[in-house]
């Protein structure tokens, strides 16, 4: 991953960042990237629900316009189903991102730990659900021979150790 970052740092043209899943974390990331006011960043928002993504992207665009920082190109790719490796592969093949950020949740609107007991996180429930999406993303990236850097924010304290234990390359 360090080598990939060094190569990316030396890149002189557009850096493509794909955000998979535009929930609250994805929206914060999108807003942050827009606030960087960098025209060399292209953001690709990928997910299932086009109408929701358009609405969320427009909110961020309006905020960036008000701040005077809307120099980033943002495109929306719908039909990217993270439970379907071929769907992810197609999305990656068409867009060729340099960085892929998985901010997805299997169930929309459920916050981390919302189905938990007092002092015990319900990892038994979330682990297999969370692992499926990032596992599929990593499989699609491998099959595309992509050199993209992958960042996973979806239950990362559970999913990243699992990925490492199965031999997936470091993110």
Predicted regions and their residues:
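Glycine-rich Rossmann-fold phosphate-binding loop(s) that bind the pyrophosphate
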Residues: 22-23
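N-terminal Rossmann-fold NAD(P) dinucleotide-binding loop
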Residues: 26-29
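Glycine-rich phosphate-binding loop and adjoining beta1-alpha1-beta2 segment
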Residues: 35, 43-71
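Conserved Rossmann-fold cofactor-binding substructure of NAD(P)-dependent oxidoreductases
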Residues: 79-95
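NAD(P)-cofactor binding segment of oxidoreductase domains
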Residues: 93, 118-144
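Conserved NAD(P)H cofactor-binding loop of Rossmann-fold oxidoreductase domains
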Residues: 103-108
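Rossmann-like dinucleotide-binding core of oxidoreductases
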Residues: 138, 142, 146-171
């Amino acid at each position: 991953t360090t080598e990939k970052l060094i190569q990316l740092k030396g890149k002189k043209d557009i850096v493509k960042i794909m955000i998979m899943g535009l929930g609250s974390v994805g929206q914060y990331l999108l807003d942050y990237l827009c606030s960087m006011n960098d025209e060399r960043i292209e953001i690709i928002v990928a997910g299932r629900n086009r109408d929701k993504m358009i609405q969320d992207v427009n909110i961020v665009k309006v905020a960036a316009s008000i701040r005077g920082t809307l120099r980033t190109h943002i495109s929306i790719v719908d039909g990217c189903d993270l439970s379907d490796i071929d769907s992810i592969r197609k999305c990656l093949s068409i867009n060729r991102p340099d960085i892929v950020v998985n901010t997805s949740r299997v169930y929309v609107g459920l916050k981390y730990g919302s189905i938990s007991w007092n002092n015990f996180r319900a990892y038994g429930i979330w682990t297999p659900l969370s692992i499926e999406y990032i596992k599929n993303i990593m499989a699609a990236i491998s099959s595309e021979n992509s050199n993209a850097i992958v960042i996973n924010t979806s239950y990362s304290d559970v999913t990243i150790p699992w990925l490492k234990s199965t031999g997936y390359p470091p993110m």
